[in-house]
Design a protein with these regions (language model features):
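Generic hydrophobic alpha-helical scaffold/packing signal
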Residues: 1, 12, 59, 87, ...
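Short, charged phosphate-coordinating catalytic segments
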Residues: 1-25, 117-122
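Generic secondary-structure boundary/loop-capping signal
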Residues: 16, 30, 67-68, 96-99, ...
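Catalytic-site neighborhood detector that most strongly recognizes the C-terminal catalytic loop/helix
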Residues: 30-36, 55, 113, 124-159
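Conserved tyrosine-mediated DNA breakage-rejoining catalytic core shared by Y-recombinases
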Residues: 13-60, 128-134
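Short, cationic motifs built from Arg/Lys/His that form the positively charged side of catalytic pockets
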Residues: 6-7, 46, 103
Length: 162
């Protein structure tokens, strides 16, 4: 969760066919993104660049998988884990954090690392509240987001090593 800082539902219900591990990309279908249901059918997929550390973890996870889901339910491989499962796992490891809190931490630290707000907001799949700008600006900032996500993963690894 800290590496990709997507929403709880986006991660826990992720399916293997959304990933291209060779290209280090994850495309979350628009229908699974936050928003009004009637708007989702036309929503493009959300691009999540995967740092090399994430790709390595996903290959390891995929090796032992027998489900279409990254995180299948314990007793039903054709369903994803429950809404509460990630929080329960965090508590089990005595980690005082909510799942959504990873998004706050990432946004705050990436701003402190001087990444531009529009790059961070694009990665977090936040809509631009300025309707005129949102209408005209369809930039995805892919190159910048790829670099940012690798820098973020390297930063997390450095914290873990210290």
């Amino acid at each position: 969760m800290p590496y990709v800082f997507v929403r709880n539902t986006e991660l826990r219900c992720a399916m293997w066919d959304e990933f291209d591990l060779d290209a280090a990309e994850w495309f979350i279908p628009g229908i699974r993104m936050k928003g009004r249901q009637q708007d989702k059918k036309d929503m493009p997929p959300h691009f999540v660049p995967l740092a090399r550390q994430v790709v390595k973890l996903l290959w390891e996870l995929k090796e032992g998988s027998n489900s279409d889901y990254l995180f299948p339910a314990a007793y039903h491989k054709n369903k994803c884990i429950t809404d509460a499962a990630p929080l329960v796992a965090l508590k089990r490891f005595e980690f005082c954090q909510t799942v959504h809190g990873f998004r706050t931490i990432a946004s705050t630290h990436l701003h402190e690392m001087n990444f531009p707000s529009q790059i961070i907001e694009a990665q977090m799949a936040h809509k631009d509240r300025n309707e005129v700008r949102a209408t005209y600006n369809k930039a995805e900032y892919k190159t910048e987001r790829i670099a940012m996500m690798q820098t973020w993963a390297d930063y997390l690894d450095a914290l873990a090593d210290s």
